[in-house]
Amino acid sequence: MRLIPAVDLKSGKAVRLYEGDPARETPYGDPVEAALRFQEEGATLLHLVDLDRALGTGENREVVRRVAASLSIPFQLAGGIRSLEALQEALSLGASRAVVGTVAVKDPGLLARMLEAVGPDRLAVALDARGLEVVVSGWQEAVSASALDLLRAWAEMGVRTLLYTDVRRDGTLLGLDREVVARVRAAWPYELIVGGGIASPEDLHLLQALGVDGALVGKALYEGRIRLKEASWRS
């Protein structure tokens, strides 16, 4: 299982939001320094999120460029990618893969065109949810769509990488909801990356036991609760 550090960008800084709430952020300084530190500690992939684009409050294009120029490892880019043009821009900024969420829920036709344009290796889908209650538009809008029905539809469309985040737990260090993660794993037959609440090596062991392919970790890395250099969770 791959451990993937998450660097969220807001107003040019690396931050973590508590339960996805933009009013409850913890700043962690220069995102380039954070990205380089994670790379030096052994990360093989970085998850970069432009929160301002996701929330419609601005963008961090230049910061993304700086991060891309500083890294020798690949990164995936998420946040506000809601058009073919935005998708192409994300990849042109250096991302090895773009991640879409709102589009995948609200506009399956556009998702299909995106998949056709760049292929499933360069496009992942994010399922952001409070448990299994799906949320979109920077986690600010709940929708009635069934999470498990969406998973089936995306698999049939050709999506091959899913990022599931439990927004209730994101940035809280409260640990995982084992039952929900198990249900998502059972419903999704392809690559699954999970985030939201991961707080300790025990959470990583749990994900590994459930057959999850990757763990998105943010606050626990910043706070030193999990260290990339330590391999104990892999055993």
Curated annotation (Swiss-Prot):
EC number: 5.3.1.16
Positions annotated as active site in the UniProt record: D8, D128
Any one GO BP annotation for this protein: L-tryptophan biosynthetic process
Catalysed reactions, as listed in the record: 1-(5-phospho-beta-D-ribosyl)-5-[(5-phospho-beta-D-ribosylamino)methylideneamino]imidazole-4-carboxamide = 5-[(5-phospho-1-deoxy-D-ribulos-1-ylimino)methylamino]-1-(5-phospho-beta-D-ribosyl)imidazole-4-carboxamide
Signal peptide: none
Pathway the protein contributes to: Amino-acid biosynthesis; L-histidine biosynthesis; L-histidine from 5-phospho-alpha-D-ribose 1-diphosphate: step 4/9
Bridged cysteine pairs (disulfide): none
Major enzyme class: isomerase
CDD domains: HisA (cd04732)
GO cellular component: cytoplasm
Subcellular localization, as worded in the UniProt entry: Cytoplasm
Domain of life: Bacteria
GO molecular function: 1-(5-phosphoribosyl)-5-[(5-phosphoribosylamino)methylideneamino]imidazole-4-carboxamide isomerase activity
Protein keywords: Amino-acid biosynthesis, Cytoplasm, Histidine biosynthesis, Isomerase
One Pfam assignment: His_biosynth
Stored NCBIfam families: 1-(5-phosphoribosyl)-5-[(5-phosphoribosylamino)methylideneamino]imidazole-4-carboxamide isomerase (TIGR00007)
Family named by the database record: Belongs to the HisA/HisF family.
Protein name: 1-(5-phosphoribosyl)-5-[(5-phosphoribosylamino)methylideneamino] imidazole-4-carboxamide isomerase
